[in-house]
């Protein structure tokens, strides 16, 4: 929910963001803010697409940083299988240290 949908506008702050998700998403956003100020230990924060759902492993996902990834149909999605692959890839070969990254199609 802390990914940007426009410059300076996070998904969390849009009218479309579901009210029932705000408590959990708000806590996650606060954690990211705390981590972004942390220099004493190595951390990585992973933000999924707007929708993370069961699906096949395709291996055809994109990585991003602070912007919500949108596919050519205007959707922000990732399967749990591909999300897991991206996280494991990061664990095996870290490339996002002291930053957040996101995964989507």
Residue ranges and their predicted role:
Residues 2-105:
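Oxidoreductase cofactor-interface core, primarily capturing Rossmann-like NAD(P)-dependent enzymes
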């Amino acid at each position: 929910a802390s990914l940007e949908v426009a410059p300076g506008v996070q998904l969390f702050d849009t009218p479309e963001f579901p009210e029932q998700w705000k408590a959990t998403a708000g806590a996650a956003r606060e954690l990211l803010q705390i981590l972004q100020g942390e220099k004493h230990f190595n951390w990585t924060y992973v933000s999924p697409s707007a929708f993370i759902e069961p699906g096949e492993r395709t291996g055809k996902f994109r990585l991003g940083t602070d912007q919500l990834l949108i596919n050519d149909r205007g959707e922000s999605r990732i399967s749990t299988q591909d999300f897991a692959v991206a996280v494991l890839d990061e664990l095996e070969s870290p490339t996002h240290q002291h930053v957040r990254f996101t995964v989507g199609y």
